[in-house]
Amino acid sequence: MTEISQILAREVLDSRGNPTVEAEVQLAGGARGRAAVPSGASTGEHEAIELRDGDKHRYLGKGVQKAVKNVVDVLAPALVGMDAADQFAVDQRMLELDGTATKGKLGANAILAVSMAAARAAADAHGLPLYRYVGGVQARTLPVPLMNILNGGAHADTRVDVQEFMVVPAGASSFAEGLRWGAEVFHALKKILKGRKLATGVGDEGGYAPDLPANEEALKLIMEAIDQAGFKAGEQLFLALDVAASEFFDKGSKKYKLKGEGKEYDSTGLLEYYRGLSERYPIISIEDGMAEDDWEGWKKLTDALGSRMQLVGDDLFVTNVERLGRGIETGTANSILVKVNQIGTLTETFDAVRMAHRAGYTSVMSHRSGETEDTTIADLAVALDCGQIKTGSASRSDRVAKYNQLLRIEGELGAAARYAGKSVFRALNQKK
C-alpha cells in the first residue's frame, strides 16, 4: 500500500553548518522515505525561495523551524491519505497549498523535502531503487562527472573570479574509471599546489581554493595536473567552467568586472575572452557565461560559441520551464543545469529536463554548495538520463556520497550500464 500515513520533519545541518529541512514520509504498508534538501551559495534571482526563520539569536537567522512547522502543520494534514506513488498529485497539492510562484509562503525547502521523501517512500513500497522507480526499465546511463577541483568566485575568498574549474573525464569507458581519473588529477593538483606553497585547503564543494593572480593560472595548473597524473588533456580529460557571471555583472554599467584581474568587459568582450580561452585549452562546457538577465549577451554567446561547446544555463534558467522555454524559443544556451531546490518539486524538475531534451538541449544534474549526505540527485541523474552530473570534487563526504551512490548503481546495472562519455558533448562528436 502506498497511501501516506504520516509525515515528519526536522531541522538538520548541511555541509556548511547551516540548518536545512529533512522530511520523512511513512506509508500505510510500512514503507518509508527520508530526504534532506540542499542550499546554494550563489543563488539565482529567480530561484524558488527557501524559508529561513530570521531569528538572529539562533543559527544567525538561518534556522528553518518555520519550514519544519509548515511541513508538520500544513503539508502533512493535507497529504495524509494521498497516494505517494502519484508524484504529480502530491506535488500539485503542495503547490496549491503554497499558492505563490516562488513557493515563498511555505518555503521551497519544506515542499521539496516532502516531494523527495514521498518518491523515496513509493520506491521503497515497490521494492525498487529510486533511479529505477523514477526512470523505469530504460534508466541505465551513468553521467559524466564534472568535477570541481579548483574554486574561485563566491565559493572562495580569493582573487579568482571564475567560480568553478572542472575536469571532465569524458574519454573514460565507465563511470568508475571516470571517477578514478578525476580523483587522480585532484591528488596531482594538490601535489603541485604544495610544491608552489599554495593553499591546499578545500572549499564548500571540495575543490582547492588557492589565491592565484588570474583565472588563466587556474587552467594552467589543472592542465599540469592532468599531465602529471598521466592523462591526455583534450583526448581523455577535458575542462569545464562555471563562471557564475551574475556575481560580477554590474547592472548599472552593464559591464562584467573581473576584479581579480582588474579588467571589465561588455558582453561582446567577455565572449571573446571565452573564445580565447577555448582556443588555448580543451574547454567543452561553460556555465553561466553571462548574467542571469543578460539575454542579449547570452544570445551573442550562443551564436558565437554554441556550435563548439556546451553553454549551460543555471541562474539563467533556474530549472524553470518558463525561463527555459524562453531560452529554447530564442536559441539561447544549449544546456540546462538541474537543481531540484531551484524549483522546489520533483514534478517540476522532471518537466524541465524533459522540455530540455525535447529541444535538443543537454541537462546537467547538480548539487548545491550546502549539501547533506542525501544522494537523491545521483539517482535522478540516472533516472532522467541527464548524462552529466556536478557534485563537487573527490573530497568531503557530502560530495563523495553522490559519487559512491553512482558507483553502486553502475555495479547493480552490471553489463546493462552505459557511460555517457563523449556522446553527450556535441562538440566532441563533431570532432570525430
Curated annotation (Swiss-Prot):
The Gene Ontology biological process terms listed for this entry are: glycolytic process
Write down the PANTHER family for this protein, in alphabetical order. Answer: ENOLASE
Which superkingdom does the taxonomy of this entry point to? Bacteria
**Pathway(s) per entry:** Carbohydrate degradation; glycolysis; pyruvate from D-glyceraldehyde 3-phosphate: step 4/5
Q: Name one GO molecular function term.
A: phosphopyruvate hydratase activity
Q: Which SUPFAM superfamilies match?
A: Enolase C-terminal domain-like, Enolase N-terminal domain-like
Name-wise, this protein is Enolase
Q: Which reaction does it catalyse?
A: (2R)-2-phosphoglycerate = phosphoenolpyruvate + H2O
Its biological purpose is as follows:
Catalyzes the reversible conversion of 2-phosphoglycerate (2-PG) into phosphoenolpyruvate (PEP). It is essential for the degradation of carbohydrates via glycolysis.
Enzyme Commission numbers on file: 4.2.1.11
Q: Which residues form the active site?
A: 205 (proton donor), 339 (proton acceptor)
Q: What PROSITE patterns does this protein map onto?
A: ENOLASE (PS00164)
Q: Which gene encodes it?
A: eno
Q: How is the cofactor bound?
A: Binds a second Mg(2+) ion via substrate during catalysis.
